[in-house]
């Protein structure tokens, strides 16, 4: 079975079994909604068990998640440092123009016929996502995911077509 990273448990939160999760997923509200099933993996990427979300809230830069049946700090403390993942079969279908992070990361980025680099990470700083593009011999390029910049995404072809606006590439 294929799993995709959703977040990393970085600490406990209070005494009632809540966990502080550093999210690395798209569609956070969907991933952590009540009754969502996630898989827990240890720091060596070994499957531990499936967990069902009992509650979720945001606190500062973290997602605070509580799992069904784990209602005390003693039940969850051992999971600090573990990863949360979603099984591929639990992913929902997306609308046209929407993509999962795992579909975008690794795609080649082109401006015309010129290869710029490859998407290595996706950041969520605010209003829109920012794609981090790894380039050979240059600093990473921060590419905002907005229509004037990202012209086409072809997951099947492994290609993203962009038009770099003036000022985006500080190495020109």
From Swiss-Prot:
The keyword Nucleotide-binding does not apply. It comes from the Bacteria. One of its GO terms (biological process) is rRNA processing. GO terms for cellular component: cytoplasm; ribosome. Its main location: cytoplasm. Keywords: Chaperone, Cytoplasm, Ribosome biogenesis, rRNA processing. It is found in: Cytoplasm. GO terms for molecular function: ribosome binding. Residues 96-168 form the PRC barrel domain. The keyword rRNA processing applies. An accessory protein needed during the final step in the assembly of 30S ribosomal subunit, possibly for assembly of the head region. Essential for efficient processing of 16S rRNA. May be needed both before and after RbfA during the maturation of 16S rRNA. It has affinity for free ribosomal 30S subunits but not for 70S ribosomes. Binds ribosomal protein uS19. HAMAP family: Ribosome_mat_RimM. Belongs to the RimM family. The PRC barrel domain binds ribosomal protein uS19. This is Ribosome maturation factor RimM. The gene is rimM.
């Amino acid at each position: 079975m294929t799993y995709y990273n959703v977040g990393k448990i970085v600490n406990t939160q209070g005494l009632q079994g809540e966990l502080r999760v550093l999210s690395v997923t798209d569609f956070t509200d969907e991933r952590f909604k009540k009754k969502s099933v996630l898989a827990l993996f240890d720091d060596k990427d070994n499957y531990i068990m499936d967990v069902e979300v009992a509650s979720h809230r945001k606190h500062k830069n973290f997602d605070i998640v509580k799992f069904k049946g784990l209602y005390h700090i003693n039940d969850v403390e051992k999971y600090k440092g573990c990863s949360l993942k979603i099984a591929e079969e639990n992913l929902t279908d997306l609308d046209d123009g929407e993509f999962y992070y795992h579909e975008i990361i690794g795609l080649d980025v082109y401006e015309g016929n010129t290869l710029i680099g490859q998407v290595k990470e996706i950041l969520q700083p605010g209003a829109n996502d920012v794609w981090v593009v790894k380039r050979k011999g240059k600093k990473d390029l921060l590419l905002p995911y907005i229509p004037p910049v990202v012209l086409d995404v072809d997951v099947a072809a492994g290609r993203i077509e962009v038009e770099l606006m003036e000022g985006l590439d500080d190495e020109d």
